[in-house]
């Protein structure tokens, strides 16, 4: 399974680079957890979690969600603490792959995957004039 995950991270790196992202690092680890891919999308620093499943196991693997938010944010904070260039927006993406054989896969890229994990606070509105 580790080999499958490594192949999925390589495929994700290639996918992101073909879409104009600059991949800074793969497989970054700290005590809080791992960040599969760190990249930039224009001025935004993007932390990407990669999940993979063999086609024989069924459809796309589930990406992370609200339950993983704390772990991912803690790992991102540790990453930012170790690196100089931190004055930029940050985003969390998910990439899920279903692999068919040695060289084929379906890939799903969920941009800003943790945006749904932010609780809706009643009465929280934008100031007038802000859209």
Tell me what each language-model feature is.
Residues 18-45:
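Active-site metal-binding core of divalent-cation-utilizing nuclease and nuclease-like domains
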């Amino acid at each position: 399974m580790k080999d499958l995950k490594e192949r999925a991270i390589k495929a994700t790196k290639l996918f992101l680079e073909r879409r104009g992202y600059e991949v800074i690092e793969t497989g970054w680890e700290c005590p809080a957890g791992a960040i599969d891919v760190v990249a930039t999308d224009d001025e935004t620093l993007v932390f990407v979690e990669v999940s993979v499943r063999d086609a024989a196991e069924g459809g796309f693997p589930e990406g992370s969600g609200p339950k993983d938010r704390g772990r991912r944010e803690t790992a991102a904070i540790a990453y930012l603490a170790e690196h100089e260039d931190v004055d930029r927006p940050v985003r969390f993406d998910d990439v899920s792959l279903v692999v068919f054989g040695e060289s084929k896969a379906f890939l799903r890229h969920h941009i800003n995957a943790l945006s749904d994990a932010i609780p809706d606070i009643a009465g929280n509105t934008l100031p007038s004039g802000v859209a």
